[in-house]
Amino acid sequence: MKRGCAIAVMICGLITSVSAASAADLIVQEPVFEPLPQPALAGWYLRGDIGYNFKSKTGGKWDFWNQFEEPYRGVDDTFNYDDFSLKGGASYGVGVGYRFNDMLRTDLTLDYFRASINGRTNCPSYVKSSHGLNPVEDNCHYEDNSKASVWTAMANAYVDLPRVGPLTPYLGAGIGAAYVKYDTWKTSEICPTCTLQSDKDGFDSWRFAMALMAGVSYDLTDQLKLDLGYRYLRVNGGNAYGYDEQDRQVINQYGQGAGADGPQAKDNGFNIHTVRAGLRYEFR
C-alpha cells in the first residue's frame, strides 16, 4: 500500500514537471526592432546655375561741360536720361553652401553677366539753336551705347518649405557686392545737321547689392537636385563714364582753361529680374 502511494506521488511530480516545461515553451518573446537610421540632412553642397536676365529700365544723369573760356568753362548743366536701359542676356553662377537641417540652408555665390546699355537724351535748347534748329521742337537728341560686365558676390539664406513628393519649394534672400565695369561709351548727336561722335572711357566701381529668390527644387536623386527659380537683384547706382577728349583739353578753340576730369555720368543702378535653372549636389 505504502509502496503504491510512493509510486503515485512520483508520477504526479513527473507530470507537473512536464506541464511546466511545456508552458515555458509556449511563452513567445516580443521582437525588438532597432530604429532605422535617419538620412543625414546637414552637410555641404555645391551649385551651378545658368539664367536669363530680362531687359530692364533704369535712369541716369550726365553733366554738360561748357568748353568756353574762363570764367564760363565748366559744368554748365546736368541732364537726366530720357531713356536708359539694360538689355537682356545670359547669366552664369557657381556657389558653395551648407544645409543645417531640412528647412534652413545658406550659400555663397558668384555670378556674372554682360549686357548692352543704351541711353537717350534730348539736346539742350542752346545746342539745337547752334545747329539752326527750333529750340522747342523734338529735333535733336543724343544716343549713348556701351556694354557692362557685372560680377556679384552674394551671401544667401533659404527656407525650404514642406515637400510635395519630390518637389521642395523655397524662399530666399541675399546681400553682397557687385562689381560693375563699363566698356567705352559711344555718343552720337542725332539731327539733320549734327556731326558729333565721341568716345568716353567707361568707369568701374564696387556697389552694394541685394537679392530676393523664390523657386522649387526637384529630387533627381537623394543628393542631386534640379533647381528652377526666379531672382530679383538690386544693384546700387554708381559712376558710368568720363568726359571725351575735347572736354578734357586745357587749350581749345575758345581759349585756355581747366579741362574736364572725373565722371561725367552716373547710372541710378539696376533692377534685374532673372529666371534660373541649376543643379545642386549635396554631400551626405
Swiss-Prot record:
Alphabetized InterPro entries for the sequence: OMP/PagP_b-brl, OMP_b-brl
Family that this chain belongs to: Belongs to the surface antigen msp4 family.
Signal peptide: 1-23
Keywords, alphabetical: Signal
Species of origin: Brucella melitensis biotype 1 (strain ATCC 23456 / CCUG 17765 / NCTC 10094 / 16M)
Entry keyword annotation includes rRNA-binding: no
Name under which the protein is recorded: Uncharacterized protein BMEII0376
